Structure formats: structure tokens, C-alpha cells
């Protein structure tokens, strides 16, 4: 499915660039065309996967030359904000669904993929409807194609939990009790790095979903209607504050990937992480600590106006430039 995803996206970018007369350039007498592809996966194992799919596409389409550029997560975000509106915009690039990409849409910088999906029923049918919702606007415009689903879970060190006599928590009160026991046993309860600021938003955003109703959040998360006056947001911050004493020291000065390393090396009994981070932990060839004995559990329940059983998750995907 992913091989087809890349192939069809590349073909879509090719057709779109020829239609607009932009980005697609002649580089030889044989009119070899260039597609610029920008992604945020310079590390293994993802980089090799992308390189393999691109090599396959170029072999099957000798008239196409794909120029690839990649960058780590946070530098990627900053560069993308600069290049998307410029003359050197990549034809295909990774982008997060929601407001991160929708601001580009409001500036007419993202191609509407709806007609391309309608013209290729096999491609359309291969995509999960539940994931496509996140890359579809209210008016029906499909602006991106997901290639994997991400979710947030607490990763925990099984050995440290057992040594401290801690059970997997299912409620927030149980989570705080677990943190106290781990701390008393000499362990850092939660490995945390908030240097880039987004890790805090993942905690608070998850808690918001439990303390604020879906209807209110939908209104507030829309730029034109957001007010953020619901008391549930204050409650969420208060819950988050209860966790702060159990984070490692200097958490705002530590990068998120360093927090992951700390967890992998035993310097943190828990780590609120994305499931896509698993290969960085236990991949036999590239993982930080392939022998780490760890498990996972969802963010413990909080009774509030929202959904106590919520699991924070979102698909990740690619979009095509309209330039």
C-alpha cells in the first residue's frame, strides 16, 4: 500500500506540475523532468524505505528525476514554513494534518487531491476512511494522503515498575500514586524533554480531551471561533501541574529525543511517547536499547466533561504543492 502511495503521489505531482507549468523542469535533451520531494525522515529505518520506493519509481519512469531533501523534525518545520510559499517549494512534502497544513491551504499553496482520487478508484479504495477524515476539509477537499497512523502512549520500564511494586495505572490518581512510589524507590518517574515546547502540548492536549467536551474543543480549535473560556482548560493545566514534580530536572532544557534516550537507558520509568518512536528504541540494528524491557499503556482516565477513554492519535502524511 505504501509503495502505491508514493507512486501515485509522485505521478500526481508530475501531472499537476505539467498542468501549471511550474516546478517541473527540463534537464536534458530527452526532457527529463524533476520532482522535488521534502520529508522529515533522515534517520533509519524510514530513510531507507523512502529511498527504496523512490529508486523503484525512477527505474519504472526513466524520464523522472526525483530530488530528495530531508531534515529532522523541528528544523524541518522551520524550513517548510519558509519554502512552501517561495519559488523553491518542493512538489511533494510531508505535512501534519490540521492547522499546520490548513494555513497553507488558505493561501492556495496546497493542491486539491480530490479529482485525482476520484480518477483512481483503486487508489481511493486503498485508503482508510477514518484516516482520510483528518486530511479532508469540511467542504470535501482532500488535501493530503496519510501513510501511517500515530498515537500517544505511556511507555514504561517493566523492571523498574516491578522493583517499585507499581501496577499499571488506569486513572490519573493511580498515575500520581505510581509516580510517588517510583520516586520513593529511587527512580525518576517520567523522562521528559520540553525544549521544543510541543511535548507539553501533547500532555495538555490529551488532558483537554478529557476535561473539555468535543463540541467546545471543536469550536475553540477553529481559528475563527476559538475563545478558550471553558473552565475545563484550566482543569487540564492543573492536572498537568500535578505531574511536574515527577519529571526529570531541567525538563524545559532537554530535547525530546534526549528524553527518549534517557528512558531507554533507564533514566526514567515512564515516557509519554508516540508509537512511531518504537523503532528508535528496540530496532535490532538502529534502536537505542533493543534489550529494554518495556510496555505501554494509554494515558490514564480523568473524569470530566470530555471523553475519559480518549486515545490521542493522528495520521501523518504527504501533500502536493499547488505551485
Region locations from a protein language model:
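Short, low-complexity disordered leader/linker segments with a strong preference
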Residues: 1-36, 59, 117
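Short, well-ordered beta-strand elements
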Residues: 31-42, 64-69, 91-92, 143, ...
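Extracytoplasmic/periplasmic substrate-recognition and gating elements
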Residues: 33, 55-60, 65, 86, ...
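Extracytoplasmic "Venus flytrap"/periplasmic binding protein-like
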Residues: 56-127, 134, 159, 163-170, ...
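Hinge/lid segment of periplasmic solute-binding proteins
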Residues: 97-153, 176, 202-205, 232, ...
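Short, solvent-exposed loop/beta-turn-alpha elements that line the ligand-binding surface or hinge
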Residues: 114-127, 211-235, 284-289, 301-309
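Extracytoplasmic/periplasmic solute-binding protein
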Residues: 138-147, 152, 176-225, 268
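Glycine-centered hinge/linker elements that transmit conformational signals in sensory
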Residues: 179-182, 222-252
Amino acid at each position: 500500500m505504501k509503495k502505491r502511495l508514493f507512486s501515485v503521489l509522485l505521478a500526481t505531482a508530475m501531472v499537476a506540475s505539467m498542468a501549471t507549468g511550474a516546478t517541473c523542469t527540463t534537464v536534458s535533451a530527452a526532457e527529463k523532468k524533476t520532482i522535488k520531494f521534502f520529508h522529515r525522515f533522515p534517520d533509519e529505518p524510514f530513510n531507507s524505505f523512502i529511498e527504496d520506493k523512490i529508486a523503484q519509481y525512477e527505474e519504472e519512469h526513466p524520464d523522472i528525476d526525483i530530488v530528495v531533501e530531508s531534515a529532522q523534525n523541528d528544523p524541518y518545520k522551520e524550513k517548510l514554513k519558509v519554502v512552501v510559499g517561495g519559488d523553491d517549494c518542493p512538489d511533494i512534502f510531508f505535512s501534519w494534518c490540521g492547522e499546520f497544513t490548513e494555513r497553507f491551504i488558505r493561501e492556495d499553496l496546497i493542491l486539491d487531491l480530490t479529482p485525482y482520487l476520484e480518477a483512481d478508484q483503486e487508489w481511493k479504495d486503498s485508503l482508510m476512511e477514518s484516516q482520510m477524515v483528518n486530511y479532508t476539509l469540511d467542504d470535501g477537499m482532500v488535501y493530503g494522503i496519510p501513510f501511517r497512523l500515530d498515537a500517544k502512549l505511556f511507555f514504561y520500564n517493566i523492571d523498574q515498575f516491578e522493583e517499585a511494586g507499581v501496577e499499571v495505572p488506569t486513572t490519573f490518581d493511580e498515575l500520581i500514586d505510581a509516580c510517588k512510589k517510583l520516586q520513593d524507590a529511587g527512580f525518576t518517574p517520567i523522562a521528559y524533554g520540553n525544549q521544543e515546547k510541543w511535548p507539553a502540548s501533547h500532555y495538555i492536549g490529551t488532558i483537554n480531551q478529557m476535561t473539555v467536551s468535543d463540541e467546545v474543543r471543536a469550536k475553540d480549535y477553529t481559528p475563527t471561533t476559538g475563545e478558550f473560556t471553558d473552565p475545563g482548560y484550566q482543569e487540564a493545566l492543573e492536572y498537568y501541574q500535578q505531574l511536574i514534580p515527577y519529571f526529570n530536572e531541567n525538563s524545559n532544557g532537554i530535547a525530546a529525543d534526549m528524553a527518549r534516550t534517557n528512558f531507554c537507558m533507564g533514566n526514567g520509568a515512564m515516557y509519554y511517547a508516540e508509537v512511531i518512536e518504537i523503532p528508535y528504541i528496540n530496532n535490532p540494528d538502529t534502536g537505542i536499547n533493543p534489550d529494554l524491557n518495556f510496555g505501554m499503556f494509554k494515558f490514564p482516565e480523568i473524569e470530566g466533561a470530555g471523553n475519559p477513554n480518549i486515545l490521542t492519535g493522528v495520521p501523518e502524511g504527504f501533500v502536493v504543492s499547488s505551485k
